[in-house]
Amino acid sequence: MMAGHPNESTPHSLRNIGFTIHMGGRDKAYNRNAVAATWGKQLDSLQKADPDGYQHLVKIYPDKGHWMDRLDAAAVPWMAKFRRNLHPKRIVWKQDDVTHSRFYWLAVDSLNRKARSTIIASRNGQTIRIPTSNIKQLTIRLDDQMLDLDQPVRIQSATGMLHQAVVPRTLAALARTLEERGDPNGMFAAEVTVVWPDAA
């Protein structure tokens, strides 16, 4: 919603983080006030459909312009109650026109970084479900906080089993994810790549 932004982004990937918008109701430049209100409605709708996600606070101050007389400072204590979760049970990853190679415990190579693609993944015990994907190939990254890496891991699509075997811990996975993130807490010990045979 900043000046000059085309405002075509969507909030779908915000499922696992707290997100807040504070906007002056009279801040009409670049249609910021209307876009902020629209995002509020979109986030309300997403949270209604998925109550465990999309924690948000959208405040439109009707009589304020771009300067909100510091009313937007309320965002700081609200955001402070959230903590990063590197291993959410459910992920909604919607790529924008600027694409990325990784998101939480999912990763794609350069051939599968498709603008506007959406991946929804969830995990429960030793099973990971990815009901739909409009990419051909996806890497799932794992560690011992997520599941038991000494036991077989099942990865299912809507049409069948994509993987069912033990996923070994490797130094390569640890090194790659440490290099990417620069964060020891963000390392993953194992990874497996699955392919959708029927993907476009």
Which residues make up each language-model segment?
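Surface cap/lid and interfacial helix-loop subdomains adjacent to catalytic sites
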Residues: 6, 23-27, 86
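Conserved strand-to-loop "acid loop" that flanks and positions the catalytic carboxylate
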Residues: 20-30, 62-63, 132-134
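Conserved alpha/beta-hydrolase "acid-adjacent" motif
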Residues: 28-38
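Mobile cap/lid helix-loop segments that gate and shape the active-site cleft of serine hydrolases
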Residues: 1-12, 16-17, 31-33, 48-49, ...
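Alpha/beta-hydrolase-fold serine-hydrolase catalytic core, especially in secreted/extracellular enzymes
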Residues: 40-200
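Structural recognition of the beta-strand scaffold that forms the well-ordered cores
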Residues: 13, 18-23, 56-60
